[in-house]
Amino acid sequence: TKSWLLENPQFNPYRFSFEKLYRKLTSRLRSLPDFIIIGTGRAGTTALYSYLIQHPSIAAASNYNKLGTAGTASTDIHFFEYMTSNNVQWYKSHFPILFSKSNIHKNSLITGEFTTTYMHHPDVPQRIFNLLPKIKLI
């Protein structure tokens, strides 16, 4: 019954979830992405990301479910469009924890994200460069 209460919008109007709370509390332990897919709507950006995360050395951002298909919530992170309302800790909360990335996978695991509207926002390239100057862009 607890999961039903959390999933029902009438009883959980603020969309509280234990997973989001855990990600927020562990955000300082999480890594930033190794790549960003910059695409546009209806151009195969989501399909490309789902193909990439099927590789065993690529971890999906947490807003993407384990099957490699779009989750029920928004799958795009939109961080670099709305940096004024979200901070870097919020952004990091979407990615794997550093020790799981380095110890379990012996530094071979990479992670990334995609947002289909980054191409349309004029401030996104400079914001990405300021935070992640060595990021790989796809």
Task: Describe the role of every protein-language-model region.
Residues 1-116, 130-135:
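PAPS-dependent sulfotransferase catalytic core
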Residues 121-138:
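ATP-dependent NMP and nucleoside kinases share a basic, alpha-helical "lid"
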